[in-house]
């Protein structure tokens, strides 16, 4: 900066300088300082020579022999384990051998492989090193007795994350080795309890008698925490038998001898009695807690709620318990799991609007929905004509949250596409399940349901639900592009094409799949819920011969509990005897049955199907489908056979086990189907006689009587139509389906307008 002055002096230019004080360390270069080493007393040369002479020489052959022995020992341990517990390989978990059962599937476990197949991910699963996890580190004395057997607990390297990995569970072999090496003898109770706590509950439930015997042989008393672990292991699963309840109650008595029951024990007790459907025991436990001034915890409320949702199926009570949890206290406010239970109850009882309101309530209360909620809403919406367009949107929200779809979610995808009649997408999704070794009975039912709901492109008037959004179209396009039906998986008989030409294609493929399932997975076809859509395929797409053939070869009358009255009947020698299992005679294929679409394998298996091992017992749903078929194909004699056999079915144990409310409900449904059957045959007087004979028992309304009223008008029977309308009007008033004029006037007077 320049500055001019009046006396014309030289210009002053200010500058800045940095003054650094002198330092001897900075002025001179650093020198490498050599540290002094401590003096070590030198060893005489004579002593070094002696040391070299004393050092032993290691034989390399001994090292090689030791390594060889170690490898042989490990191989022997694996061979022994495979000999003790042979593997059960089935047709849907390996390509080398086709067995007769599917892999065990746990619905609650996530399946990463399924998600990767859907999203066409090319990433590889992270491999775990073959070492015992820290969570399975045993006490030192137990490790000494186990030796190398503990390596059996490590799962083999696999690219699959499916529940089939539980087959490598070798805890029984490990306990056998421990028992042979001394068992629990001379071990502290703490070490024993630490070891038992390492066993997963699903494995522990089958090993409890063996462990108790080891305790007894060692003379060690079982700690109450170990008894509690036994109880938790036995309480796994959806239901608990009376025999298991007796064992569990015995363990609770042993716990009470050692300590006073705590809140955790009471919570488990109630959960156990809920799964046993024992209301009396639940009330007793609640009474004991009330006497001890123990408040009801959130876990107890959840157990009671689950009893109403899954066991007693009382939706009204479930709503009451849920509302109590909301307004009782801050500690009992519902979380995402509680919301999931009540929303599932809404979907099971077709209360879709209530379920959607609860979802909005969760978002208002900043409660993040979980995958179970969105999956249940998707399935529930698919069953509603009004809300079916929202089904796929709920499923796609799972991907928006970045969650990995569970096996249950994938099953719901199959159900939604099957309910919509999208056979191509359902076949592709089922093919993906075959690739990932995760086929379940629910998935098989959905496949049969898709076949039953198939409509040809010319007769279908609505687009598929998945095609209504851009995400849905891309989803279906990606799935179809990644499936090649020309490459069968495990020999599953999909026809080698992704396009469905006509109904004959559906009949042929479903028959081939049914034959394959009988040979490889017979447990699938023993369920009436599987047989019902299989029969509906023939009802919708086939002829009467197709339907009757499937009815006789896939279902049978379970005569347990039916009185053997027919045994005393006198039968002529030339007269053919009737089948003891069913009044419906098996239709043998002949030259006239040219239109029968049936797999040739089923004809070869007909001899094995006579013992009913590979058939489903007939229930009310099967008889209703049979009546529909009799009405559609106008087979009056067949309808009479169904009515007669349905009367026998009502005497069986299968029907008697139902509650009186459920029995009345099923009888009303059968009577309704019988009226429709007679109407289709133009037998309106017979249909009216069915209504008239049961008018005092069943709530006949316009919903059930409109077809009969319409048929009477079309046939010119005005008197019968008037009688039908009179029954409908009187039942509306009787069953509170219509308000009377006087009651309406009182209602308006109280309301004020």
UniProtKB/Swiss-Prot annotation:
**What does the UniProt entry say about where the protein is found?**
Mitochondrion
User: What residues span the transit peptide?
Assistant: 1-76
- Spans of the PPR repeats? 262-296, 297-332, 335-369, 370-405, 406-441
Name any GO cellular component annotation. Answer: mitochondrion
Q: Please name the InterPro entries in this protein's record.
A: Pentatricopeptide_rpt, PROP1-like_PPR_dom, TPR-like_helical_dom_sf
Listed A to Z, the keywords are: Mitochondrion, mRNA processing, mRNA splicing, Repeat, Transit peptide
Q: Which GO terms describe its biological process?
A: mRNA processing; RNA splicing
Q: Which Pfam families match?
A: PPR_long (PF17177)
Q: Give the signal sequence positions.
A: none
- Domain of life of the organism in this record? Eukaryota
Q: Tell me the protein family, please.
A: Belongs to the CCM1 family.
Function as written in the Swiss-Prot or TrEMBL entry: Regulates mitochondrial small subunit maturation by controlling 15S rRNA 5'-end processing. Localizes to the 5' precursor of the 15S rRNA in a position that is subsequently occupied by mS47 in the mature yeast mtSSU. Uses structure and sequence-specific RNA recognition, binding to a single-stranded region of the precursor and specifically recognizing bases -6 to -1. The exchange of Ccm1 for mS47 is coupled to the irreversible removal of precursor rRNA that is accompanied by conformational changes of the mitoribosomal proteins uS5m and mS26.
Please give the subunit comment from the record. Binds to mitochondrial small subunit 15S rRNA.
Q: What else is known?
A: Involved in mitochondrial-nuclear incompatibility, a major determinant in reproductive isolation between species, through hybrid incompatibility of Ccm1 and its interacting partner 15S rRNA between yeast species.
- PANTHER family to which the protein is assigned, alphabetical: OS03G0856100 PROTEIN, OS12G0638900 PROTEIN
Q: Which NCBIfam families match?
A: PPR (TIGR00756)
The protein depicted here goes by the name: Mitochondrial 15S rRNA processing factor CCM1
Species of origin reads Candida tropicalis (strain ATCC MYA-3404 / T1)
């Amino acid at each position: 900066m320049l500055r001019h002055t009046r006396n014309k002096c030289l210009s002053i230019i200010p500058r800045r300088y940095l003054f650094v004080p002198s330092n001897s360390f900075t002025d001179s270069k650093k020198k490498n300082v050599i540290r002094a080493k401590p003096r070590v007393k030198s060893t005489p040369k004579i002593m070094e020579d002696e040391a070299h002479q004393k050092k032993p020489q290691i034989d390399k052959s001994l090292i090689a022999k030791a390594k060889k022995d170690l490898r042989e020992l490990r191989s022997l341990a694996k061979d022994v384990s495979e000999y003790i517990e042979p593997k059960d390989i089935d047709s849907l978990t390996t390509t080398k051998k086709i067995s007769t059962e599917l892999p065990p599937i746990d619905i609650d476990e996530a399946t990463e492989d399924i998600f990767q197949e859907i999203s066409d991910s090319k990433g590889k699963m992270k491999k775990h090193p073959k070492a015992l996890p820290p969570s399975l580190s045993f006490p030192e004395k137990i490790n000494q007795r186990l030796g190398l057997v503990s390596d059996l607990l490590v799962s083999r390297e696999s690219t699959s994350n499916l529940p089939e990995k539980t087959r490598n569970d070798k805890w029984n072999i490990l306990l056998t080795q421990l028992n042979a090496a001394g068992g629990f003898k001379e071990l502290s109770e703490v070490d024993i309890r630490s070891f038992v706590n390492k066993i997963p509950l699903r494995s522990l439930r089958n090993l409890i008698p063996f462990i108790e015997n080891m305790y007894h042989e060692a003379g060690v008393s079982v700690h109450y925490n170990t008894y509690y672990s036994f109880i938790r292991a036995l309480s796994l699963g959806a239901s608990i038998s009376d025999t298991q309840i007796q064992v569990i109650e015995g363990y609770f008595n042993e716990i009470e001898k050692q300590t006073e029951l705590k809140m955790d024990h009471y919570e488990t007790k109630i959960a156990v009695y809920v799964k046993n459907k024992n209301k009396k025991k639940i009330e007793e436990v609640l009474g004991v807690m009330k006497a001890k001034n123990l408040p009801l915890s959130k876990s107890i409320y959840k157990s009671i709620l689950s009893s109403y949702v899954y066991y007693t199926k009382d939706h009204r009570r479930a709503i009451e318990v849920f509302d109590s949890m909301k307004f009782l206290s801050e500690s009992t406010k519902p979380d995402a799991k509680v919301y999931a239970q009540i929303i599932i109850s809404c979907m099971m009882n077709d209360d879709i609007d209530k379920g959607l309101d609860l979802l909005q309530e969760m978002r208002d209360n900043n409660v993040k929905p979980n995958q179970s909620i969105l999956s249940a809403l998707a399935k529930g919406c698919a069953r509603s004509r009004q809300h079916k367009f929202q089904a796929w949107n709920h499923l796609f929200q799972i991907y928006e949250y970045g969650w990995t779809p569970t096996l249950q979610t994938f099953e719901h995808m199959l159900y939604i596409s099957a309910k919509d009649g999208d056979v191509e997408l359902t076949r592709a999704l089922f093919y993906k399940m075959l690739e990932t070794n995760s086929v379940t009975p629910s998935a098989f039912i959905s496949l049969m349901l898709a076949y039953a709901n198939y409509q040809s492109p010319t007769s279908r008037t609505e687009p598929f639900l998945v095609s209504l959004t851009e995400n849905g179209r891309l989803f279906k396009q990606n799935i179809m592009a990644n499936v090649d039906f020309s490459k069968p998986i495990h020999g599953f008989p999909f026809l080698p094409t992704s396009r469905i030409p006509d109904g004959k294609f559906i009949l042929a493929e479903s028959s081939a799949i049914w034959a394959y399932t009988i040979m490889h997975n017979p447990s699938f076809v023993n369920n009436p819920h599987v047989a019902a859509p299989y029969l509906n395929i023939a009802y919708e797409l086939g002829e009467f011969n197709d339907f009757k053939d499937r009815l006789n070869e896939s279902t049978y009358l379970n005569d347990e509990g039916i009185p053997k009255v027919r045994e005393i009947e006198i039968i002529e020698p030339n007269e053919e005897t009737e089948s003891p299992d069913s009044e419906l005679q098996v239709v043998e294929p002949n030259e006239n049955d040219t239109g029968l679409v049936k797999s040739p394998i089923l004809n070869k298996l007909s001899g094995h199907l006579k013992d009913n091992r590979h058939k489903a017992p007939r229930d009310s749903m099967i008889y209703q489908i049979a009546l529909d078929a009799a009405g559609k194909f106008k087979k009056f004699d067949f309808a009479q056979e169904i009515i007669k056999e349905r009367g026998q079915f009502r005497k069986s144990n299968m029907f008697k086990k139902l509650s009186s409310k459920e029995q009345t409900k099923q009888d009303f449904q059968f009577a309704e189907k019988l009226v429709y059957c007679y109407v289709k045959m133009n037998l309106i007087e017979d249909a009216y006689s069915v209504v008239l004979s049961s008018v005092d028992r069943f709530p006949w309304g316009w919903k059930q009587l409109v077809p009969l009223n319409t048929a009477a008008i079309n046939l010119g029977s005005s008197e019968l139509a008037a009688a039908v309308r009179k029954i409908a009007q009187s039942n509306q008033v009787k069953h509170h389906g219509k308000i009377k004029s006087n009651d309406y006037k009182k209602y308006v007077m109280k309301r004020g307008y």
